[in-house]
């Protein structure tokens, strides 16, 4: 997942006010992984484009040429979701895809503009 802003994470208490302000001023986009119900911040990049690229790279590192089912999730940002889906479809060995809204519990904490990939093996 990549967050468009840390403002909602700040309001939910997951990120401090100073961190959110600095991220906003520097146009930093955090990268988070949700695995087994645990959210972990795993990186930060300077632009939205770089963040989406890094999300795809992480998927490639995990699945390389392995056949996968691919889902793109988004929080009120269908356009970014569609772009991410098109890019990912061209790079992965995809068996099936879906694009859907991010769950309400995550969208509330991460805010609008959050976009991510969900990959799992097709075999």
Describe each region flagged by the PLM:
Residues 1-123:
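Mixed-charge interfacial surface used for oligomerization/domain docking
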């Amino acid at each position: 997942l990549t967050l468009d802003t840390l403002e909602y994470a700040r309001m939910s208490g997951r990120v401090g006010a100073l961190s959110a302000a600095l991220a906003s001023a520097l146009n930093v986009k955090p990268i988070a992984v949700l695995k087994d119900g645990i959210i972990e911040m795993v990186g930060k990049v300077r632009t939205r484009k770089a963040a989406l690229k890094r999300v795809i790279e992480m998927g490639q590192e995990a699945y390389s040429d392995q056949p996968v089912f691919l889902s793109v999730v988004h929080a009120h940002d269908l356009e970014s979701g569609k772009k991410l889906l098109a890019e990912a479809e061209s790079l992965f060995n995809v068996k099936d895809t879906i694009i859907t809204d991010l769950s309400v519990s995550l969208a509330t904490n991460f805010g609008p503009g959050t976009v991510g990939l969900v990959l799992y093996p097709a075999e």
